[in-house]
């Protein structure tokens, strides 16, 4: 016999994150950690604050429903950026850091992002000339 699972109504990943954050007894408990040296740890509270702060900045620069191109390696800041984009009411367009120039050109021309978030100067250099056009 199948049991019905009772699930609280969560509308999206942002709500799920903040609900989990509320339920944390120790907000300083480590949530995310980078793998590269020097290692950086992010507590639930730091992550929450970073998401809110970046989201507020994104809202100043964009309109609800705009696309945001996110070019980053798999790292804690990717998670923070993605949830910030969603919280700001934007659409995340994720891109691999290993794409060729023509791939970035296609994505940028196709999605027409209002803003681009990159993980470092190396990633920025890959797309800056495309963005100028």
Regions found by a protein language model. Give the residues of each.
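Short, flexible active-site loop motifs that bind/organize anionic cofactors or intermediates
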Residues: 37, 44, 94, 113, ...
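Alpha-helical structural signal in soluble globular domains
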Residues: 84-88, 126-133
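Conserved ATP-dependent adenylate/AMP-binding module captured primarily in the ANL superfamily
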Residues: 99-130
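Active-site-adjacent beta-strand anchor residues
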Residues: 7, 71-72, 117
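N-lobe entry segment of adenylate-forming
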Residues: 1-61, 66, 83, 109
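Conserved AMP-binding/adenylate-forming
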Residues: 40-41, 55-101
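Residue-level recognition of oxygen-bearing side chains
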Residues: 46, 53, 77, 112, ...
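Proline- and acidic/polar-enriched loop/turn elements at helix boundaries
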Residues: 33, 69, 97, 118-120
């Amino acid at each position: 016999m199948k049991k019905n699972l009772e699930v609280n109504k969560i509308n999206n990943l942002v709500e799920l994150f903040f609900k989990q954050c509320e339920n944390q007894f120790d907000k300083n408990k480590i949530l995310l950690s980078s793998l590269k040296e020097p290692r950086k740890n992010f507590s639930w509270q730091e992550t929450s604050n970073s998401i809110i702060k970046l989201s507020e900045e994104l809202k100043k620069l964009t309109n609800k429903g705009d696309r945001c191109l996110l070019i980053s390696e798999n790292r804690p800041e990717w998670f923070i950026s993605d949830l910030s984009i969603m919280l700001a009411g934007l659409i995340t367009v994720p891109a691999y850091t290993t794409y060729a120039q023509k791939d970035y050109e296609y994505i940028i021309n196709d999605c027409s992002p209002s803003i681009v978030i990159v993980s470092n100067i190396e990633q920025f250099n890959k797309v800056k000339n495309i963005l100028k056009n």
